[in-house]
Amino acid sequence: SKWNANKILRGSASALSQDIKFSKVNYYVKKHGFSTDATIEMIEEIVNDNDIVLTAIGDCGSCCSSCIRDAVALEDRGIPAAPVITTEFVNETKLTRVAIGMPDLKPVVIDHPVSSITNDEVLERVKIIKEQAQEVWLGQRQDI
């Protein structure tokens, strides 16, 4: 995992649990690296074990692309997915969404970078994810 990504994701799950009563929070790690698409088997496992999902973190070109493609794979199977990307990859995200046939997928957008930030900056990103992920899941998020 990228430096601070785990802190951001676990912090986001904790922050979201203040508003949402999760019966369980699951974490998945791709065996072949975070910049690859999830395998069909992993997608099916996620679908079977979750009602809503964060896919993350799109903070480089390949990571952004796989984050969006994973979210689309989950959305196609009926699981609301909130892909988390950074400000540097907003345009790439728009292009990817259109190219793979889901232009209306709304991402969560946090400040770039992710790796070289302070604990206070981690908390700022967690706060943004808490707010925007709920907007995505409820269909209230405006496009980027």
Residue ranges of each PLM-predicted region?
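Metallocofactor- and cofactor-centric catalytic cores in central/energy metabolism, strongly enriched
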Residues: S1-R77, A82-I100, K106-I144
